[in-house]
C-alpha cells in the first residue's frame, strides 16, 4: 500500500492522481483500492503499447492488486498532484548511465506520451565519477 506522508514537507499527505504503468502481451486484470474504499477492477487487452491504469480524487492511500498478468512487465507507479512540479526518479545507483542506452527509444517515446517531460536531470554518484 502506498500512502502520502507529512514528515518531510507539508502537502504530501495526499495526491490527486495515482497510476500504474505496464506493457502486456496477454490479458492483465488489475484492481485498485483508494483510501481503503471499494475495490475497482479493470481488464486490459494487449495493444502493443505502454498502458496505464489511473485513478483520480483525494488519494491518501492506494493499493494496487494484480489479479491476472499473462506476459506483463510492470514499470512503475506514480502518485501526482495536478499542478506544480512533478518529479520522476529512476534510481540507478552505482550506474554510469550506460544502462539507459538499452531502453528502446520507442518505449521512451511512449512514456513521454503518457508523462510529457519538460526537463530530464541525470545524477550520478561519486563512485561513478571517481
Stretches with model-predicted labels:
Residues 1-33, 37-130:
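Conserved SGNH/GDSL esterase-like catalytic core that processes O-acyl groups on lipids
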Amino acid at each position: 500500500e502506498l500512502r502520502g506522508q507529512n514528515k518531510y514537507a507539508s502537502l504530501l499527505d495526499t495526491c490527486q492522481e495515482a497510476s500504474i504503468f505496464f506493457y502486456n502481451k496477454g490479458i492483465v486484470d488489475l484492481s485498485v483500492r483508494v483510501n481503503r474504499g471499494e475495490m475497482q477492477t479493470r481488464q486490459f487487452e494487449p495493444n502493443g503499447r505502454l498502458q496505464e491504469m489511473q485513478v483520480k480524487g483525494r488519494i491518501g492511500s492506494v493499493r494496487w492488486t494484480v489479479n491476472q498478468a499473462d506476459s506483463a512487465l510492470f514499470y512503475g507507479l506514480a502518485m501526482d498532484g495536478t499542478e506544480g512540479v512533478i518529479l520522476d526518479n529512476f534510481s540507478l545507483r552505482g550506474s554510469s548511465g550506460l544502462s539507459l542506452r538499452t531502453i528502446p527509444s520507442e518505449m521512451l517515446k511512449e512514456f513521454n506520451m503518457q508523462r510529457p517531460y519538460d526537463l530530464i536531470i541525470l545524477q550520478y554518484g561519486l563512485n561513478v565519477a571517481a
